[in-house]
Each structure stands twice: as C-alpha cells, then as structure tokens.
C-alpha cells in the first residue's frame, strides 16, 4: 500500500515502482523506524491525538513487530512495500486495524527517515569505535612483544634509519586514535533529533520536541525544520571518517604486504589470513591485506558520490536524498569489516627478527649518525652531510657497511673522525639517540606503549 495514493488517478508504472522503491536497502532501518514510531506515539498522547490506551496498544504492537524483525529481518524483503516506513505502517495496521492509521498524524517520511538514519548512524558509530579500539589494542600488544625487533625505516621506499617493529605498530595506533577522535566528534554533531519537523515547515501539533528527542536517546532536538529534513552532513562526515580510516588501513595493509614479501621477509602472516594459488603450489598470498587495500577505493567512491548528489540540491527534501543510504551502508560495513580483518591479521603474525636486523644493518641507515657525530665535533651540518655522502660512496665501492670502513679511510673525508666513531655507528646507538618524545629509543617506545595501554585501559 502506497502512503500517497489519493492524489493520483493512475497506478504507477511497474518499472517506475521498481526504480522508485527503496525497501531493498532501507529495510536495514526497520528497528530504528519502529523505535521512532513508539516515541512518536507517546508524543501524540501529549497533544491529544491518541489516548493513553490507544498509545499502549500501538506500543505493544510495535514491540511485537520489533521482535519479529529481530528474529527474521529478511522477511521484510518479501514485501511489495515502497519503503521501510510503508512496511512498518502496513504491518502495524495488520495488527491493530484502523488505529494504526492514526500514528502518522503530524509526521512526514521526511523527518521520519532523517531520524531513522541518525539513529542507525549512532549505533553504527558505536560499533566502529569498538572495532577501532580493538585494533588499537592488537597493535599495542604486538608492539609490546616486539620492542627489540630492529628493522629499517623507510622514506621513498628506500632504507632510511633504523626503527623497531614496535615503533611501526605505534605509528598506526596514532592514526587509529585520530580516527577514533573523528568518530567521537561526528557523533556529537549527529546527536540531534529531526523528528517533529514534518515535511519541511515543522509539525502543526505543539509537541515538545526536546522531550521527544530525549525519549529517542538524542542529546537535543534540531533548531530549524528546513535544515533538519534536508541535512545529510552526518552522512558526509561519516563517509569522510570512513575514507580517512580506510586510507590508514590501506597503508597498514601495504606495509605488511611489503614486509611479508620475499624481497623483505620481515614478517610471516598466519595461514588463517592467507590463501594459495590454483596453479603454483608454493604460493602463500596475503589476500586479507590485499582486500583491505582494494576495498579502500569503494569507500572513497561513496564519499565522492554523496558529495556530488548533495551539491546542487535546493532546500528542502528531494528524492535525490534516497541515494544517501546504499553508499553509506556499504562504506561503513566495509570499514567495520576491514577493522576486524586487520586485527585478525595481527593475531598470529610472526616477526622475523634476524632478517629485520640484517636489513637494518644494510643500506647505510646509520649515515645520519655519522653526520651527527661530525656536527658534535664542530663541523657545520651541511658540510657534514657532504662528507658523509662521500664516505657512503667509498663504502659502496668497497662493498662494506660504514662501520666496517677502516679509520684511515674515514679520515680521508674528515680528520676529526676518531676511534670513538664506531660505537656511534651501531644500530643500538642509532636507536638510543632518538630519545626525544615520539622517538624510536627503547625508553620512548616503552613509554608510548604504557601511555597507549593506559588510554585503552589494557
């Protein structure tokens, strides 16, 4: 049953109906629609539209419907209803008869769907926050047991300076902490209820919208009805949060794909998150990580698509806004799945310390230490930089690391270099010297782990 048939003398073309209907995806808002309807029934009592007994009958029927939906949400898709609002109203009328037709008094699908979607977003944000913190915790635990795993750090995918696997893990903890903060910030802005704004001009009934918002668990009610029914900022913000979060997960995946490769060999992934080849029996492919990396693109696409949908819309509601849900649902589902999968990847990962150490000792990652040593001897940094570059060329020519060059060879480039240079060039010295806050020194890494554990209550 359509909710708008009285104005029309012809039935909708079946092709238009299929094009127009949204039940196939907005069925996911069933629980929120029912919860919102219960609250609206209470509001109608306060303005005399419903008696207390009528409201009780409606609430009881809606609660029964809620349990039926929770038991089998797929039943909704067997209906020919236009959207979830039509489906809920139809089911309610089946249960309570003509009384069910009174529930929509003073309410529009415009404020109804805006409310449903915000309720869904609030619940989903809480799920995302939980998954985000679980991944942060997994990274912290992985860092805890790999504080002594020295590996090369990279710039331009070239070995740059030695770091530890723990320090690498903590870098992603920081990214995820920002993702968490963004979600919490978004939650504050979407925590306002549009219910009671009607189609665009507000409801004709003197409903206490602040009280209504409180019944639904919102912090407050919105302030302008035109804006309220056409506002999809929270959709854009959540898609933006998801896009940024997925970029972080994609980088995480790319790093581990490289670390797991035969060329690097720094880690080995668990059999539980890898797959084989149908042709090459030796292969162990990092499919979980590659899928995380690949799924990043669809989330970016959802954000771009929603921005383009909204950019030219006049106030207030337009049917274009029906396009807000599929992209949002898919993007947040994808982000949530990838957060869980990233945590699973860390569960069982093996860090190959000898190979990491070997790689850290290659590539002249201690060259900066030699430059700093020269600066400490009074050589201007720019000159020291040039001297070390020449020393690296000589080391490459001899096929040796810097610390293996004889003192006489080093002194060809600067007479200030003495025997005391060799301890400075050790990997441990390279790490120990980075002792400022945020650095890779063992003390700073241990402190960062302690701070993260305290924040996450581990």
UniProtKB/Swiss-Prot annotation:
GO BP, one annotated term: L-arginine biosynthetic process
GO molecular function: argininosuccinate lyase activity
Reaction catalyzed: 2-(N(omega)-L-arginino)succinate = fumarate + L-arginine
Compartment(s) of residence: Cytoplasm
Biochemical pathway: Amino-acid biosynthesis; L-arginine biosynthesis; L-arginine from L-ornithine and carbamoyl phosphate: step 3/3
Coiled-coil stretches: none
One Gene Ontology term, aspect cellular component: cytosol
Key word Lyase present: yes
Tagged with keyword Lyase: yes
Keywords (A to Z) from UniProt: Amino-acid biosynthesis, Arginine biosynthesis, Cytoplasm, Lyase
Pfam families the UniProt entry points to: ASL_C2 (PF14698), Lyase_1 (PF00206)
Enzyme Commission code: 4.3.2.1
Listed InterPro entries: Arg_succ_lyase_C, Argininosuccinate_lyase, Fumarase/histidase_N, Fumarate_lyase_CS, Fumarate_lyase_fam, Fumarate_lyase_N, L-Aspartase-like
UniProt-listed PANTHER family: ARGININOSUCCINATE LYASE
Matches recorded under HAMAP family: Arg_succ_lyase
Family (UniProt): Belongs to the lyase 1 family. Argininosuccinate lyase subfamily.
Name of this protein: Argininosuccinate lyase
Annotated gene: argH
């Amino acid at each position: 049953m359509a909710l708008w048939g009285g104005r029309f003398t012809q039935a909708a073309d079946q092709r238009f109906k299929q094009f127009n209907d949204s039940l196939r995806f907005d069925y996911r808002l069933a629980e929120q629609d029912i919860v919102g309807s219960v609250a609206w029934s209470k509001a109608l009592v306060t303005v005399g539209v419903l008696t207390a007994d009528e409201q009780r009958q409606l609430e009881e029927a809606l609660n029964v419907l809620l349990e039926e939906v929770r038991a089998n949400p797929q039943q909704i898709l067997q209906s020919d209803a236009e959207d979830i609002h039509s489906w809920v109203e139809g089911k309610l009328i089946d249960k309570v008869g003509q009384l069910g037709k009174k529930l929509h008094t003073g309410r529009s699908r415009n404020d109804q769907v805006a409310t449903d979607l915000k309720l869904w977003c609030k619940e989903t944000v809480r799920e995302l926050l939980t998954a985000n913190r679980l991944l942060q915790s997994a990274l912290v635990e992985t860092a805890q047991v790999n504080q002594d795993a020295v590996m090369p750090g990279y710039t331009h995918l070239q070995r740059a300076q030695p770091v530890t696997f723990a320090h690498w893990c903590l870098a992603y903890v920081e990214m995820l902490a920002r993702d968490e903060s963004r979600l919490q910030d978004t939650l504050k802005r979407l925590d306002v209820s549009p219910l009671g704004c009607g189609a665009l001009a507000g409801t004709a009934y003197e409903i206490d919208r602040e009280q209504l918002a409180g019944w639904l668990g919102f912090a407050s009610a919105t302030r302008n009805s035109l804006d309220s029914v056409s506002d999809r900022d929270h959709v854009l913000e959540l898609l933006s949060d998801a896009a940024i979060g997925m970029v972080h997960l994609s980088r995480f995946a790319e790093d581990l794909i490289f670390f797991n490769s035969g060329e690097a060999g720094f880690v080995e992934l668990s059999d539980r998150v890898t797959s084989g080849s149908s042709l090459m029996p030796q292969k162990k492919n990092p499919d979980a990580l590659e899928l995380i990396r690949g799924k990043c693109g669809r989330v970016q696409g959802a954000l771009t698509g929603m921005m383009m949908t909204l950019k030219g819309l006049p106030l207030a509601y337009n049917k274009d806004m029906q396009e807000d849900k599929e992209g949002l649902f898919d993007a947040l589902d994808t982000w949530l799945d990838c957060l869980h999968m990233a945590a699973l990847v860390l569960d069982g990962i093996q860090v190959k310390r000898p190979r990491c150490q070997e790689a850290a000792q290659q590539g002249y990652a201690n060259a900066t230490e030699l430059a700093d040593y020269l600066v400490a001897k009074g050589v201007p940094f720019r000159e020291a930089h040039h001297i070390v570059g020449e020393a690296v060329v000589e080391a490459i020519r001899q096929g040796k690391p810097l610390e293996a060059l004889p003192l006489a060879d080093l002194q060809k480039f600067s007479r200030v270099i003495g025997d005391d240079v060799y301890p400075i060039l050790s990997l441990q010295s390279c790490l120990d010297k980075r002792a400022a806050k945020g650095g890779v020194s063992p003390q700073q890494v241990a402190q960062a782990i302690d701070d993260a554990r305290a924040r996450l209550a581990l």
